[in-house]
């Protein structure tokens, strides 16, 4: 009897202390699934860009909000989602792991490591889709970001916080310029993010290997959404990269981000939009493709001092077809960015590397970030090249040229030889200024064109190894033009070196 009373008392006590916790879940059902997209009914309160969870813990993103159906892109193989599957709202937007732990790592578009190294600490996360800094949170670009490439730093300079497009046909050296820019940030306290969209895994593996070999991977994060990845992951990759870069920018750091390339990103978004049955527009791209790219690139900025003064410098890459920069996506991105570096395949095939078309390349804000000394040294370069290109076109008609015209042609050929540069060998600002002084003061006129490569190599070695001359160079103030006396001393040393070189006394 007592035993029955005890059991009854225990049950009564459990009932009195029971706290019923009711969990509400917004759930729906998959109506149609195919090609990586599911149409779902029953979760009408879902937000745009919200994560939803299918059975088997498969995630998707709500990208189409209609009256009765929700268009969801599936973030895994569509074989794991079936018609009739249950879908649950997560009430959270997609986010990615951020922080210094990502330096030296290779991750996918969701922030999951794919380099075989240790797992990441996921306690620090940031939303992939965030708003760009407001106008009041920014300031004008006034600090230079050196690429180490003479033709770029002198003619189309890039500033921290700028968006500079690299555009050209395939196999013209677009990625090479971007990677060289990353290599040149070593020791400059600039973090780098390289986003590979639709690239071959083998090509990205070579890039990662090069960065590691050159000691650049330690300040770089690589995000890979390869050609074999699903369209949703290729679409998300650049926004993931921007979120990672924004974390560092808000921590008062300077960041360089490469989007390689936005042509493939546009194709991935077009694929998604057509599968979601959105109306196609020009070249079958959806109507909001301009918004997608402007929303992405506007997240690159130079923050004001009140916001910490951090920056994101973006180098988006666009691939053209047969040099057509008037196509839809190229014109879109050209109008969004602060300038473009146009690479021409004819220049590349003729051996001019980097194959930059000076006439079509421009930097709209970068000159404000150049030092006064660099501005002075490069002031006559663009004019010399413009005169050369004009005369070169005229000379093709077989007209007889006077001595002055022939001098301009010869000088232009030599300038282009000076501008040639091997990849993975960036030049310091001092080295660039010394080469530009050669051009500015017409000292290359006494050299033969075929001897320019050998002369350039010997001259740069002389600048670094001759103690007295090196002291003069190191005393140059980048914020001021050269004093006449200092310039005269430097020119005398250079002239003496050229005379020795022409006599064959320099090896």
From Swiss-Prot:
MF-aspect GO terms: ADP binding; ATP binding; proton-transporting ATP synthase activity, rotational mechanism
Transmembrane segments: none
Catalysis performed (reactions): ATP + H2O + 4 H(+)(in) = ADP + phosphate + 5 H(+)(out)
Enzyme Commission designation: 7.1.2.2
Cellular localisation: Cell membrane
Keywords: ATP synthesis, ATP-binding, Cell membrane, CF(1), Hydrogen ion transport, Ion transport, Membrane, Nucleotide-binding, Translocase, Transport
Cellular component, GO annotation: plasma membrane; proton-transporting ATP synthase complex
HAMAP family assigned to the protein according to its UniProt record, in alphabetical order: ATP_synth_alpha_bact
PANTHER family the record matches: ATP SYNTHASE SUBUNIT ALPHA, MITOCHONDRIAL (PTHR48082:SF2)
Name of protein: ATP synthase subunit alpha
Organism lineage: Bacteria, Bacillati, Mycoplasmatota, Mycoplasmoidales, Metamycoplasmataceae
């Amino acid at each position: 009897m007592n035993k029955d009373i005890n059991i009854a008392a225990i049950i009564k006590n459990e009932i009195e202390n029971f706290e019923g916790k009711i969990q509400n879940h917004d759930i729906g059902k998959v109506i149609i699934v195919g090609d990586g997209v599911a149409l779902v009914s029953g979760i009408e309160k879902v937000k745009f860009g919200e994560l939803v969870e299918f059975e088997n813990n498969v995630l998707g993103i709500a990208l189409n909000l209609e009256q009765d159906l929700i268009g969801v892109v599936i973030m895994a193989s569509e074989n794991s989602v079936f018609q009739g599957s249950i879908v649950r709202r997560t009430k959270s937007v997609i986010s990615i792991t951020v922080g210094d732990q990502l330096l030296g790592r290779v991750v996918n578009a969701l922030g999951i490591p794919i380099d075989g190294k240790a797992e990441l600490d996921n306690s620090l996360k940031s939303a992939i889709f965030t708003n760009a800094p407001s106008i009041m949170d920014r300031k004008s670009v006034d600090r230079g970001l050196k690429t180490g490439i003479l033709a770029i730093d002198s003619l189309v300079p890039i500033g921290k916080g700028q968006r500079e497009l690299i555009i050209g046909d395939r196999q013209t050296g677009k990625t090479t310029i971007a990677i060289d820019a990353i290599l040149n940030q070593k020791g400059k306290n600039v973090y780098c993010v390289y986003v590979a969209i639709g690239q071959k895994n083998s090509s990205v593996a070579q890039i990662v290997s090069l960065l590691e070999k050159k000691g650049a991977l330690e300040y770089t994060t690589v995000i890979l959404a390869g050609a074999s990845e699903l369209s949703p992951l290729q679409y998300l990759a650049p926004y993931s990269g921007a979120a990672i870069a924004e974390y560092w920018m808000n921590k008062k750091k300077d960041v360089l981000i490469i989007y390689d390339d936005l042509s493939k990103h546009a194709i991935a978004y077009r694929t998604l939009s057509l599968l979601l049955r959105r109306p196609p527009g020009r070249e079958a791209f959806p109507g909001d493709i301009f918004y997608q790219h402007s929303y992405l690139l506007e997240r690159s900025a130079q923050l004001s001092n009140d916001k910490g003064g951090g920056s994101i410098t973006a180098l988006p890459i666009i691939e053209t077809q047969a040099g057509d920069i008037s196509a839809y996506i190229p014109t879109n991105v050209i109008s969004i960015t602060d300038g473009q570096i146009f690479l021409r395949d004819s220049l590349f095939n003729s051996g001019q590397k980097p194959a930059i078309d000076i006439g079509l390349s421009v930097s709209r804000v970068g000159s404000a970030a150049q030092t006064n000394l660099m501005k002075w040294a490069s002031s006559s370069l663009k004019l010399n090249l413009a005169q050369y290109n004009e005369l070169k076109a005229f000379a093709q008609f077989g007209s007889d040229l006077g001595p002055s015209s022939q001098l301009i042609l010869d000088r232009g050929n030599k300038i282009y030889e000076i501008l040639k540069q091997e990849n993975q060998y960036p030049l310091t600002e001092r080295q660039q200024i010394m080469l530009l002084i050669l051009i500015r003061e017409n000292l290359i006129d006494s050299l033969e064109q075929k001897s320019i490569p050998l002369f350039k190599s010997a001259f740069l070695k002389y600048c670094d190894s001759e103690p007295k001359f090196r002291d003069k160079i190191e005393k140059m103030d980048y914020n001021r033009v050269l004093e006449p006396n200092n310039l005269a001393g430097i020119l005398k040393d250079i002239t003496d070196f050229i005379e020795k070189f022409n006599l064959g006394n320099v090896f």
